[in-house]
């Protein structure tokens, strides 16, 4: 299992051929306490830059975008009914989507730094 980070505030956890995307500590800090969440993309094929989720937090209203292409295999629909799950530090609770068919080189371009400063 490997975890990498995207500059827009997402983490990506790779476990075999499954890639779990969730809200990182940076994303939580940027948005503040999440009060509303809209999962824009819940099925099908995801392209890099597609909006996957819109959130309203104490500090900002933000759209989060996909860091790479992939096939959605699961969406955490619980975060729409309980958006405070995104405030959790637990990756079992704060995940957004799970993908397959991700190119390894796209994943490897993400940062190893928890608080990346710029997009690679």
Residue ranges, per PLM feature:
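Acidic, low-complexity mobile loops and tails
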Residues: 1-48, 88-120
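Conserved hydrophobic positions within beta-strands
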Residues: 9-11, 64, 72
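Residue-level recognition of beta-strand microenvironments
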Residues: 12-14, 58, 75
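Beta-solenoid/beta-rich acyl/carboxylate-transfer cores
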Residues: 45, 63, 69-71
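Generic structural signal for buried aliphatic residues
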Residues: 46, 52-53, 73
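Short, charged beta-turn/beta-strand-edge "cap" motif at the junction between a beta-strand
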Residues: 51-53, 58-60, 78-79, 103
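Short, Lys/Arg- and Gly-enriched loop/turn segments at beta-strand edges
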Residues: 56-65, 82-85, 107
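Short peripheral tails and domain-boundary helices/loops at the edges of structured domains
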Residues: 69-89, 95-97, 102
């Amino acid at each position: 299992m490997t975890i990498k980070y995207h500059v827009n505030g997402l983490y990506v956890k790779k476990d075999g051929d499954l890639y779990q995307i969730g809200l990182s500590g940076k994303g939580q800090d940027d948005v503040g306490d999440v009060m509303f969440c809209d999962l824009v993309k819940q099925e099908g094929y995801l392209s890099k830059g597609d909006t996957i989720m819109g959130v309203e937090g104490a500090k900002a209203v933000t759209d989060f975008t996909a860091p790479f292409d992939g096939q959605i295999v699961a969406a955490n629909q619980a975060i729409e009914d309980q958006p405070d799950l995104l405030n959790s530090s637990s990756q079992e609770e704060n995940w957004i989507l799970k993908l397959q068919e991700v190119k390894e080189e796209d994943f490897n371009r993400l940062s190893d730094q928890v608080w990346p400063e710029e997009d690679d």
